[in-house]
Amino acid sequence: MDPGKDKEGVPQPSGPPARKKFVIPLDEDEVPPGVAKPLFRSTQSLPTVDTSAQAAPQTYAEYAISQPLEGAGATCPTGSEPLAGETPNQALKPGAKSNSIIVSPRQRGNPVLKFVRNVPWEFGDVIPDYVLGQSTCALFLSLRYHNLHPDYIHGRLQSLGKNFALRVLLVQVDVKDPQQALKELAKMCILADCTLILAWSPEEAGRYLETYKAYEQKPADLLMEKLEQDFVSRVTECLTTVKSVNKTDSQTLLTTFGSLEQLIAASREDLALCPGLGPQKARRLFDVLHEPFLKVP
């Protein structure tokens, strides 16, 4: 058999067979960077993805500053969007009851949330950062972020309006010299009718949020003055309203004269003889006890 011919006697070209060329069209713009890897090396260089910029900051200030600003100083982190399978609650209207602290999605990633452990909390579509009750809300502000974006808190307060009776500005002091910034914030809170609370750590800020929510339904008895109902306590409270007369002087007078009637009937000299009273206190007490009552028309 002739090596230059095939089985049918057709002459074949000398040398190795020629390779067929295939052209695969590849649109470089349709390949998302970092998702699909091209099968063939292209002369067009793809943009590199900086993975270091996607790392989550350690503090809330770094977390908020690293996000792009929207509008006039407003920050809404890109991580505030609902995750897959997570549906934020609808907006909680002022006056609506809830057993949980309603947290705005813009606070996602705030280290303060790690220390809110004693009361439940959940994300919801609300205007303030935290809704602590039917008429109580809170805005969170880092002093480090405030120094870089001083107009941010003004816009937040304007958007908040008068929807809540008690509005708390919870400030985390995370700078070395906070005096000037705190002075400006204190003045702003007075004009905006807000309550300014300072926290020196995320843990302390979390405790403030927990306390506001835990005491939402409790009465104000702990803050009110407790008045004793017994006779001695009521007489002591009455006598101590006289200038320079203290509780010790009141007990001395009651022990010396025995009753309020005899105390009123005593002369100025008798009052001055009481130990620890003196002529000046005796004169003031005598004048008060013998002044005529004012008639209210």
From Swiss-Prot:
Chain residue ranges for the region called Disordered: 1-39
- Which Gene Ontology MF annotations are present? damaged DNA binding; promoter-specific chromatin binding; single-stranded DNA binding; TFIID-class transcription factor complex binding
Motif span (Nuclear localization signal)?
17-23
Name the segments for region: HhH2, dimerization with ERCC4/XPF. 220-297
The protein's UniProt keywords, in alphabetical order, are: Acetylation, Cataract, Cytoplasm, DNA damage, DNA repair, DNA-binding, Isopeptide bond, Nucleus, Ubl conjugation
Which residues does this entry mark as bearing N-acetylmethionine?
1
Q: Which residues form a coiled coil?
A: none
Protein name according to UniProt: DNA excision repair protein ERCC-1
